[in-house]
Amino acid sequence: MNIICGYNVNIDSVYRISGVEISELLKNCERTEILEKIEKPPGKILSESDFVAGLAYCMKNGCGAEWLVLERAVFEFLKNRYFEKSLVRMGGNAGIMANALSQLGVSRVIPNVAVPSKIQLSLFSGRSIYFPGLTAERKGNSEAESGKMDSKEMDSKEIDSKENMYAVSSSQEPIHFVFDFSKGDTFSLYGTQIIIPRENRFIATCDNLNLRLYVNPAFEKYALEQACEIDGALISGFHLLLENYHDGSSYKTILENTLYQLKSWKTKNDKLRIHLELGHFASKNIANSVFLEFGAISYSIGMNEDELATLRHFHGVPGEEILLMEAEAVGNAVYRLASRYKLKKIVIHTREFVLTVFKPNLELNSKLVSELNSEPTSKLNSKPAPEGSADLRVLEELGDFESSSLQKIAGGKLESLRFGVSCAGAYAASGRLEGRKFVEEEALKLQESTIGKKQLNLFLKAFNGQALGQGAYAFNGEYILCMLPTLLS
C-alpha cells in the first residue's frame, strides 16, 4: 500500500507550562494590554504580549488554539526560553500521520517536507518513508528505489548532504511551540485566581512555508507521475493559511492550486481515496472554503470538537454544546454536515470519545437503510423524523438478514475506531507506535474515558442506538453513526 501525506510537516517543541510560570510571564507584561487582548484575542502573535495573552486566554477558558508567530523577535524569544527544555518531536498532521502509517506496516509513505533539515528528517520513522528527490538521490540500488528507509541509512553525513541540497539553515526550520496545560492548575491573572477548567494546549506557530501550503517540487512531481500507484492521500495543513499575504496574494489562489493538484491525481486514479484533516482555523472564511471545496472530493473528513463548532453555521447546532463534548450535539451536527453536503464520512475525535457518521459502502445496505427510514409510521410505530433530529431507526426494526448485514458494517467501523483509539492512546502514553502488537499491549494499560462512557450512554438514549462491544451505533437516513470512548492513561 502506498500513501501520500501532505502538506504540513514541522518540528513540535512541546512544553508543559504551569500556573506558576504563566503568572510570572503575566507579571512582566502591562496589565491593561493583556486584559484587553484576553477580552479580544488578536488571533496572531506580533509581540511577546500577544503570546502571553493567547496562552492566558486558553488556560483561563480551558480551550485550545493555534496562533501564527509573525515576528522574528518573538520566535527567538520562544526558542531561547523553551526549545532546549522541551520535548522535540515530529509535528504537523502530515508528518505525524506519515510516521504512524510507516510504523503500522504501510509499505511506502511519501510525505511532503517543506524544509528537510537535519532535525526535521531525524524525526521521521526509519521504516518505509520515501523522500522524492532525496531517497533515490542517496542510493541507486533497488532498496532506494523501493522507498524503504532503514534507520541505519540516516547517518549525519547523509542528512547533511540532504540539508545542503536544499540550502536549509536551522533558522528557517518550521517550529511549532506547543504549550500543554493541566486541568485544576491555578494562576494569578493580576490578582484574580484562575482555576484551569480543562486540559488543553496553546500553539505558537513559526512556519513561513507551511502557512503557504508549500509543496516540495520533488514531492509534487512524484505524486503526479505515480498517482496510479497511490492508494490513499492524507491532506492537512489548511488551517495555517492566511487570508492575505505581504506580496498581495491570498489563500484563494493557494486553495485553487491545491484543488487542481488533487483533481489531477484523481483524474489519473479515480480509485484514489483522499482524507481531509481540518485544524484550528484563524479565519472562518478559510475554514468555510476548505470544507466546501475539499470536502466534496474527499472520501472522509476528520476534525475535533473545536473545528466542528467552527462550522456551526453549516449545521446549526449551538457551538457551546459541541465544545462541552455532548454526544447528542456532536452527533446531530456531524449528521447534518454529512447529509446536507452529501459527504461519505466524517470522523470527530475529542479527548473523551470519537464519533463518526458514514454511508455504508455497499449499495445494498445503503438501500436497506433508506427503505427502513421510509417505512410507513404504522409499521415502524414512529413518526417521520425531520433532518437532524434524534428520531433514528434501530436494527430491531429490520428483518434478520438486513439486521445482520448492517450490524456487521457497524461492527467493522467500530473495530476500526477501536484500533484508532488504541493507536492514539498508545502514542499519547508512550510517544511511540511500534506495530500492531505494541499498540494492543499498550492499550491494555489504559482506561476508558469516564466522561466518554457517560456520553456513550447519552448517545444511546438520544439516537435510539444499539450497544456493540465497547461502543454503540445508530441509523439516520442513509447514514450510520458510531461512537466509542477514548483510552486515557
What is each of the regions a protein language model found here?
Residues 1-488:
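Ribokinase/PfkB-type carbohydrate-kinase core domain
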